[in-house]
Amino acid sequence: MLSIARGMAKELLPIAGEPVLGHVLRECARSGITDVLVVVSPGKDAIDAYVRDAAGGFGMPARIETAIQSRPHGLADAVRVGRAFAGNEPVVVALPDNLFVDAQQPAVAQVIETFARSRKNVVGVTRITPDIAASRGPTPVYPGARRGDDFDIESIPSKGAHGSTFSLEGARSAMTGVGRYVFLSGAFDLIDTVERSLASGQELDDIPVMQSMLARGTLIGRVLDGTFLDVGLPEGYREATERVAIR
């Protein structure tokens, strides 16, 4: 990604004239979310400036704040930065390097819909096929069964050695989790519990947290309508610049 970003925060890379982060903020606003916390790593002052200008603007959430994840320690650790911001409410998590196009409904709204119906933690899932695997990141395959828009996840494999892109593991297609979630307020305590079980120095990722949710029967998948674009990869970013138009 450095070959494209060239020192720019990747969250601010332009797609159809707007930063990647802006597309996700607009998606949140279209989904009815008025309060957003953007978690950033140290030294990304440009993101803070962008957020200050964007908050309350046309098509943007009314309140957008930033908080710093002091060191890169995994997605679950980044989620935990938002504990005080979320209070005792469920929290939506949307990763800016995952975009969705050609959907009848924003991806954030879709996972919220499934949460409202199931009252469970929700992870967005999508189908990966051979023609797009090389432009999607190396997330694990989720075995399970689809029921309408729901996806009953059988298991979530732990992260092991992997390449730089998605592996179908010989299958013609496979389901995987992508960067749209709803977590119940209890997820923050669960993240703390999972952290205590990790080996020293091990990253506090979302996978072991969702594995614990699945074991407790409190996690469900939502099959997301629309085309998933992984702009965290150069190939995915180029695809997104060709397909995304400002709405």
Model-assigned labels for residue ranges:
Residues 38, 93, 123-124, 221:
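Structural beta-sheet core signal
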Residues 11, 63-65, 152, 218-220:
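Conserved beta-strand segments of alpha/beta enzyme cores
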Residues 156, 165, 172-247:
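Conserved alpha/beta core of the MobA/IspD/sugar-nucleotide pyrophosphorylase nucleotidyltransferase superfamily
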Residues 1-5:
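A phosphate-binding catalytic loop at a beta-strand-loop-alpha-helix junction
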Residues 13-14, 18-93, 99-104:
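Conserved N-terminal catalytic core of the sugar/cofactor nucleotidyltransferase
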Residues 67-69, 124-125, 159, 222-224:
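Conserved beta-strand termini and adjacent loop/short-helix elements that scaffold enzyme active sites
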Residues 101-189, 193:
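Conserved core of the sugar-phosphate nucleotidyltransferase
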Residues 54-61, 114, 145-148, 211-214:
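Short, conserved catalytic or adaptor-binding loops enriched in Gly and charged residues
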